[in-house]
Regions:
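Active-site neighborhood of phospho(di)ester-bond hydrolases with catalytic His/Asp-centered motifs
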Residues: 3-6, 59-60, 84-85, 113, ...
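Active-site gating/metal-coordination segments in enzymes
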Residues: 55-56, 64-157, 194
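Short, acidic/polar
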Residues: 38-48, 91-103, 185
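Mid-to-C-terminal alpha-helical segments outside catalytic/metal-binding sites
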Residues: 1-9, 13-56, 222-228, 237-272
């Protein structure tokens, strides 16, 4: 079975401590039940992926020089990594568009991530619209964090209701809701029924706690393949996430789509 982890992070131990040392993220270790202070390097990530049977990881990078570093890692390990560009600065939309166009020349650039909790700029803010527009034009999916986040920040900026305007204004844009969207799963299922280009992922969320109605949705003949698996390693351990994901009561076809089939179709530009 082709397994694709939608969200992995390469981070040094120093970087992990610095990240978790920020006031808004200080509760993350307890919230996820993992210290995550040791970080993980490329070889450690590959060893973990090999052990667990994960073929490809979607590597989270910034729009700065970390993007080139991540793409170099993808080049060094063909087929093992694709790269997601995390939008950190929403204040300079034109620069972001130029960066996306440049980085999209590399086929390992698989998606752009909008994470409203980080900069407190809402999903439907006008500053994000140029990013959505260029991604729609280039056929690159956008991942958008939705729901109440673990960090102690205002969550209204990523309420799933804010997706509606984006989906209306960019009908050909593929949007993947990130980090589960809890406690708004029912709303997100209704949106997915309505919008064929909307997907959801369980990144940074324990699969054993998936809403039973969502699991039924994932198993249905009509909507299977609309929810994607991902861990957020090392912040949420890949081992725990994948073990719990494989234990869900999904039939073989639904499980294959959940664990990697849909991600491969949407994100692997070399396979199109």
């Amino acid at each position: 079975m082709d397994v694709v982890d939608l969200w992995v992070n390469l981070v040094t131990s120093e970087g992990a401590r610095e990240f978790l040392g920020q006031a808004q993220f200080a509760n993350i270790p307890g919230y996820l039940g993992s210290s995550s202070t040791e970080g993980i390097a490329t070889e450690g990530m590959l060893a973990l992926m090999d052990e667990l049977g994960v073929a490809t990881g979607i590597l989270c990078a910034g729009m700065d020089r970390t993007a080139e570093h991540a793409l170099a890692v993808a080049d060094e390990h063909p087929g093992r990594f694709l790269v997601a560009l995390g939008l950190a600065d929403s204040e300079r939309p034109t620069r972001n568009v130029r960066r996306i166009r440049k980085l999209a020349e590399h086929t390992a650039t698989s998606m752009v991530r909008v994470m409203p909790l980080n900069n407190q700029v809402a999903i439907d803010d006008a500053r994000h619209y140029p990013v959505y527009s260029v991604c729609e034009e280039l056929g690159i999916p956008v991942g958008i964090n939705v729901g109440i986040p673990g960090p102690r920040v205002r969550s209204r900026v990523q309420h799933p209701e804010l997706l509606e305007g984006v989906l209306i204004d960019f009908p050909d844009l593929v949007v993947i809701g990130a980090h589960m969207g809890h406690p708004y799963e029912e709303l997100l299922m209704n949106y997915m029924r309505k919008w064929p280009n909307l997907y959801l992922s369980c990144t940074a969320y324990a699969p054993q706690y998936l809403d039973p109605g969502l699991v039924q949705f994932m198993n249905s003949k009509t909507y299977r393949g609309r929810v994607l698996w991902g861990s957020d390693e090392p912040w949420f351990p890949m081992r725990r996430s994948l073990t719990e994901a494989r234990a869900l009561p999904l039939d073989d076809d639904a499980m294959a789509l959940f664990l990697g089939g849909t991600a491969r179709r949407l994100l692997d530009r070399s396979a199109r």
